[in-house]
Amino acid sequence: ADEGDDFTFSACYDVYKSGNEAWNEQKKRFEPILYALITDMVFTQENTEVTSVTVPEMINRCGTQKAWIESNNGGAGFEKLIRKKIKAISEPFYQGANKESRIITNSASVNAQIIMPLGWEERFPKIHEHVTGFLRDFPANEHDDPEDGLTGIYEKELADGDTRPYSQATRGIKRRN
């Protein structure tokens, strides 16, 4: 959201594991149900000079362990800029999948597994208005940044059912045939 008309959306959250399990049809096994409880969010149209201060401040204040930063356009430069300012592991990623299909396909899971904080309507009025007024007809929406960000949280943290801590998730040998 440096010079264009896009917004910067960033969210901090805690991942919780339910005591219940659900059947995963793809993996043919029961897996724990994971939830992301949103703790803080930034949604602004300010330029990089401002967001390179506000986003790292939020990440550090919330005690975030891993920061996923989309590096499609200017995101790679933004990630390099804030990497030195945060205590979390910085993980840039390229999002090549179709944004519209990702948001629509995962919308039911995002609604069920991402929990907003109590009183988020007053605390984050712009995000609340945007998310609750989002239309399935994409051209009717001026922006889709919060929806894309929430879908990304689901895809990166909840969809695979991996409950290992970040420090253990990257250990060991990965074998690919």
Question: Where does each model-flagged region fall?
Answer:
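RNase H-like, metal-dependent nuclease domains and their acidic two-metal-ion catalytic environment used
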Residues: 1-93, 117-177
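Short glycine-centered helix-capping/turn motifs at secondary-structure transition points
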Residues: 112-116
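Conserved beta-strand -> loop -> alpha-helix junction used to position metal-binding or nucleic-acid-contacting
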Residues: 87-111
